[in-house]
Amino acid sequence: MAISSAEGMELQDPKMNGALPGNAVEQEHEGFLPSHSPSPGRKPAQFMDFEGKTSFGMSVFNLSNAIMGSGILGLAYAMAHTGILLFLALLLCIALLSSYSIHLLLTCAGVVGIRAYEQLGQRALGPAGKVVVAAVICLHNVGAMSSYLFIIKSELPLVIATFLDMDPEGDWFLKGNLLIIIVSVLIILPLALMRHLGYLGYTSGLSLTCMLFFLISVIYKKFQLGCTVGHNGTAVESKSSPSLPIHGLNTSCEAQMFTADSQMFYTVPIMAFAFVCHPEVLPIYTELCRPSKRRMQAVANVSIGAMFCMYGLTATFGYLTFYSSVEAEMLHMYSQHDLLILCVRLAVLLAVTLTVPVVLFPIRRALQQLLFPSKAFSWPRHVAIALILLVLVNVLVICVPTIRDIFGVIGSTSAPSLIFILPSIFYLRIVPSEVEPLYSWPKIQALCFGVLGVLFMAISLGFMFANWATGQSHVSGH
């Protein structure tokens, strides 16, 4: 679920969203893209006739942008509650499962010639399927918007206080809740009221660049700071839980290879949130030069592999800097007066601020298609939906105590739905029994994959609700 996780949906043309002519549905079996009856003397159009112009490398870059998101900030926290080896093993499992999930999507797309995640839902489950898929994508994007605004709430007061040489907890105009409202009204809302994305679509490249800068800075600061636990004033004290000392759970600079506590059940949801890119896979497939299922799977594997390395390095060096005291929003751990980290904060704030309206566009579009499918464009409705969404997300961010809860809930609901459950349902319903019998090994695998997603969702939500009910979320949370 990625800083640019929704961008591809909005940039698609009507065909890419499945708005195909009626006779096109009858021709879906002929190729990945529908074609009309050829004129006399012309050969029928095939998939290669609609070949995209995007190179393999650029497709990898685009999909990496779709994967990369705010979830990277919470991975060191996840490692602190599982240990280095267990975390890396779980991260590898999520990466491999994401790759298999994309394999299922590409197989379904090849069978029916549909290029949008929502349209696969309609083909598999009828109109209700399209509604369910659109609702899940909207939920995930609302979660992504919330995580971006929470970063603004957490980091902007530190940036302003640094420039003004003030205590970030001192004056009223440095309160995070007030600042996210100001940013939403003055910057995000005007951008969200645009009818088209325009140059906002290029913020995806900015987001990946900022996160690469963040990774390099995390590695550099580890070697510069050494051990920060308990005695190094560079680390910012945790303010979300006054009862916690700065040294947190571990009083020494000793890395844990394996560990377990009540917070470890946030680990896999945070990882799942960090790997969601599935609604963008088919649009990127459409634009791929010399498209084929094998070539697009290679794009996905390279992108996921690159993000696995980037996530693993960020989590490892972040954890080895702060150990068990690391917070769910790792950037908040560094000193507000550190010049390098100040530059990182500015870059991340710029990226997430410009990405919020990009994520809002497909949510509004989905709501309009579901609630007002036959209505012409209306400025009052266009503005009202944007206002309602921004108010809803602002209230959510103000009320939620930590970004970990956002990562946890979205990573336990929409993420397993998009990665595990829906692709397996699509495969079971769309791939005909003549091609793959119901009791064939591929369909049994897909069924087990979907069941795994349901179990993952139920277990993660169950433990999180238990934590909230017992108050452990606040006692142990950062």
Curated annotation (Swiss-Prot):
Keywords: Cell membrane, Disulfide bond, Glycoprotein, Membrane, Transmembrane, Transmembrane helix
Positions of transmembrane segments: 58-80, 94-114, 132-152, 173-193, 199-219, 264-284, 302-322, 341-361, 383-403, 406-426, 446-466
Reactions catalysed: L-serine(out) + Na(+)(out) + H(+)(in) = L-serine(in) + Na(+)(in) + H(+)(out); L-alanine(out) + Na(+)(out) + H(+)(in) = L-alanine(in) + Na(+)(in) + H(+)(out); glycine(out) + Na(+)(out) + H(+)(in) = glycine(in) + Na(+)(in) + H(+)(out); L-glutamine(out) + Na(+)(out) + H(+)(in) = L-glutamine(in) + Na(+)(in) + H(+)(out)
Coiled-coil intervals: none
Pfam families listed in its UniProt record: Aa_trans
Ranges facing Cytoplasmic side: 1-57, 115-131, 194-198, 285-301, 362-382, 427-445
The protein's name: Sodium-coupled neutral amino acid transporter 5
Organism of origin: Bos taurus (Bovine)
Gene name, Swiss-Prot/TrEMBL: SLC38A5
